[in-house]
Amino acid sequence: GVQRYTFDAVVSQQDTILSGLDLDCGSYLGYTSPLQGLTAFVPTS
């Protein structure tokens, strides 16, 4: 079946909130923040 993931992140410089991102199978989420040195990958396979 299809697996869904929710990713919430705060980008300090932009004060931007990324929320409720739904990804389908075979997709992945890549988030990077140079300021925070944060890298997150969410495989949905």
Swiss-Prot record:
Catalytic activity: Hydrolysis of (1->4)-beta-D-xylans, to remove successive D-xylose residues from the non-reducing termini; Hydrolysis of terminal non-reducing alpha-L-arabinofuranoside residues in alpha-L-arabinosides
This protein's UniProt keywords: Carbohydrate metabolism, Extracellular matrix, Glycosidase, Hydrolase, Multifunctional enzyme, Polysaccharide degradation, Secreted, Xylan degradation
A single GO molecular function term of this UniProt record: xylan 1,4-beta-xylosidase activity
A Gene Ontology biological process term: xylan catabolic process
Domain of life: Eukaryota
GO cellular component annotations of the record: extracellular region
Keyword field contains Secreted: yes
EC number per UniProt: 3.2.1.37, 3.2.1.55
Distribution of this protein across tissues and organs: Strongly expressed in young roots, significantly reduced expression in older roots. Highest expression levels seen in root tips, some expression seen in root nodules and in the flowers, but not seen in other aerial parts of the plant such as in the stems, hypocotyls or leaves.
Keyword Secreted: yes
Protein location: Secreted, Extracellular space, Extracellular matrix
Function comment: A bifunctional beta-xylosidase/alpha-L-arabinosidase, exo-enzyme that acts synergistically with endohydrolases. Releases xylose and arabinose from cell walls.
Family named by the database record: Belongs to the glycoside hydrolase 3 family.
Protein name per Swiss-Prot or TrEMBL: Beta-xylosidase/alpha-L-arabinofuranosidase 1
Record organism: Medicago sativa
